[in-house]
A protein has these predicted regions:
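Short histidine-centered beta-strand/loop micro-motifs
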Residues: 19, 61-63, 73-74
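N-terminal first-folded block
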Residues: 8-44
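Generic N-terminal initiation segments characterized by hydrophobic and/or small/turn-forming residues
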Residues: 27-28, 34, 40, 49, ...
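A short, surface-exposed loop/turn module that caps and links secondary-structure elements
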Residues: 36-63
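Enriched for short, Lys/Arg-rich terminal
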Residues: 1-6, 15, 25-27, 67-69, ...
Length: 99
């Protein structure tokens, strides 16, 4: 049996979640994805989970819905999922740089 991953998050992720709540997004959808990641369950294809490149090399991106993303890092050696950002494409990639 595989042990679950520890889940950590950034302060920016916490701010992003607050913004998502203010926008009326269903946070349960986000939490459902985090739960799947925590137990290393493969995400269904509808989430379009994939590795990023360039400035975001090493980060994973999945789509909670078409314009609601979750960016995270996954360290398989020490079994930690680090939640980095969540928000729209423009929230995260708007200026082309990491925030």
């Amino acid at each position: 049996m595989n042990l679950p991953y520890e889940v950590t998050n950034t302060k920016q992720y916490e701010r992003d979640v607050k913004l998502a709540k203010r926008r009326g997004l269903d946070i349960e959808q986000l939490l459902a994805v985090v739960r799947m990641l925590r137990v290393n369950e493969p995400l269904p294809e509808k989430y379009h989970n994939h590795l990023l490149h360039g400035d975001y090399k090493g980060y994973w991106e999945c789509h909670i819905n078409p314009d609601w993303l979750l960016l995270y890092e996954k360290d398989t050696k020490i079994r930690i999922i680090s939640l980095y950002r969540t928000g729209s494409h423009s929230d995260i990639f708007g200026n082309g740089k990491k925030r």
